[in-house]
A protein has these predicted regions:
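C-terminal nucleotide
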Residues: 4-14, 18-154, 162-179
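DPxDG-like acidic metal-binding loop motif
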Residues: 1
Length: 179
């Protein structure tokens, strides 16, 4: 928490704690957030697995397609549509994602990634459509969603497209889960 506070000191829009938690907790984790717990900045509940079979399976079906860095001047928070129905859909998709991973169910994992992408687009449309983004990022993502069981962007405005598939997309990298 001290590192998080130091990293975000004085920022109007602090970064989320998801990346920090991903570095600290081993294995595969589900992070649940609740606005009534520490203002929603830290998980209210964390569920993790280090099951070797699940880890090996996930490493075999998740592929990262590089997008490049965020463009200068990019701000995904310009438009915020905090519609409770979409927020619930995003939370449900996150829970379904973790359940699909633990069950080693590629189709369900793909569906959860696609649903997460749709929810993020509704809640924060500038993630995909911002004046500083070159090209049609949402269209690119839709192409991966149509060709593979599922896909979503790893971060706002840059990073990677995460693809769930038995076969690696061209130019993709594999992941490694730290246990």
């Amino acid at each position: 928490r001290e590192l998080y506070e130091a990293e975000n000191e004085g920022l109007t829009d602090p970064s989320g704690s998801q990346d920090m938690c991903g570095l600290i907790y081993p294995g595969i984790s589900r992070l649940d957030y609740d606005a009534s717990v520490e203002g929603g900045w830290f998980p209210s509940h964390i569920e993790s697995t280090c099951d070797p079979a699940v880890v090996t399976w996930l490493e075999s079906v998740i592929h990262l397609v590089p997008l490049g860095p965020r463009p200068d001047g990019y701000n995904p928070l310009l438009t915020r549509n905090m519609d409770p129905a979409w927020v619930k859909r995003l939370g449900d998709a996150g829970a379904a994602c973790y359940d699909a991973i633990v069950a080693m169910d590629l189709a369900a994992l793909g569906d959860s990634l696609n649903e997460s992408s749709r929810a993020w687009r509704a809640i924060l449309p500038n993630i995909y459509e911002h004046e500083t983004i070159k090209g049609d990022l949402w269209g690119l993502l839709e192409g991966y969603m149509a060709e593979y069981p599922g896909a979503m962007q790893s971060g706002c405005g840059g990073g990677y497209i995460i693809v769930a598939s038995d076969e690696p997309p061209a130019g993709s990298a594999r992941i490694s889960v730290r246990v």
